[in-house]
């Protein structure tokens, strides 16, 4: 593919890089010239993606990362810095869902969703920003943090309230962090994808209900991962120097 924005001389850390969007972004960023650090609990999967990147001539490192555990996050950033230097492009992508009506979802399921999708984003973004600020991002203006939200944060529906609320929360968190770090050279933005066929969806879109949902979209299709590529590269690049505190809905018109 043609790379619209270069990430040469950048080091990117992708949280939640073991599958789906995270693994896709890791390969994309490597193609754009970044050193890529893949963080996730499933290290066997991140190792496979890292090996694929290295075999293609890129630079990659797979590290264990549990976004609900601050010590794990710190260790992941330590490993990244030891290998490549300060991480200056961060993607907060880790996320889980516990589908079900709100009256049926168990408390531990709710806590897991909030812990991963909201607290995890907070902790990863905070650790990255701390290190960027300590490395003089104020002068360099090189900090880029991209949060992966969801169009569910802007819609109402049945059966996934915890997930939708967590994504609405991180969108507002992103704006607040952007304001907090605006004079420190750290930009924070949120991308809201539409429905994409990934592991988090399971086999939902093969069911009658899932097929009906797709049929209700204006273009009657799921979104392709690659439709996010240009925006993700842009927000992580030097070209996005003046973009912070923004939300971008990229959903193939699904929310219209």
Give residue ranges: language-model regions.
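C-terminal substrate-recognition "lid" of short-chain dehydrogenase/reductases
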Residues: 84-85, 221-250, 255
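Alpha-helical segment proximal to the catalytic Tyr-Lys
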Residues: 130, 179-183, 241
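Substrate-binding pocket helix/loop in short-chain dehydrogenase/reductase
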Residues: 101-102, 106-114, 201, 213
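Conserved glycine-rich cofactor-binding loop
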Residues: 11, 18-19
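Residue(s) in the substrate-gating loop at a strand-loop-helix junction
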Residues: 150
């Amino acid at each position: 593919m043609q790379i619209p924005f270069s990430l040469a001389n950048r080091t990117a850390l992708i949280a939640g890089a073991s599958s789906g969007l995270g693994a896709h972004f890791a390969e994309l960023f490597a193609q754009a010239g970044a050193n890529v650090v893949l963080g996730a609990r499933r290290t066997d999967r991140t190792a496979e993606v890292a090996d694929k990147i290295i075999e293609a001539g890129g630079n990659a490192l797979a590290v264990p990362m549990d976004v609900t555990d601050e010590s794990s996050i710190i260790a992941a950033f330590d490993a990244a810095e030891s290998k490549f230097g300060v991480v200056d492009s961060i993607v907060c992508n880790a996320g889980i869902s516990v589908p079900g009506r709100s009256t049926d979802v168990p408390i531990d399921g709710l806590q897991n969703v909030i812990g991963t999708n909201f607290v995890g984003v907070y902790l990863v973004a905070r650790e990255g920003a701390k290190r960027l600020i300590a490395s003089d991002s104020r002068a360099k203006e090189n900090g880029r943090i991209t949060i992966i939200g969801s169009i569910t944060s802007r819609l109402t529906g049945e059966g996934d309230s915890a997930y939708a609320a967590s994504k609405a929360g991180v969108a507002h968190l992103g704006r607040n962090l952007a304001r907090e770090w605006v004079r420190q050279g750290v930009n924070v933005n949120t991308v809201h994808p539409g429905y994409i066929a990934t592991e988090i969806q399971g086999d939902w879109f093969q069911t009658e209900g899932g097929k009906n949902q797709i049929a209700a979209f204006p273009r009657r299709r799921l979104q392709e991962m690659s439709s996010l590529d240009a925006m993700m590269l842009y927000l992580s690049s030097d070209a996005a120097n003046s973009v912070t505190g923004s939300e971008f809905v990229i959903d193939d018109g699904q929310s219209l």
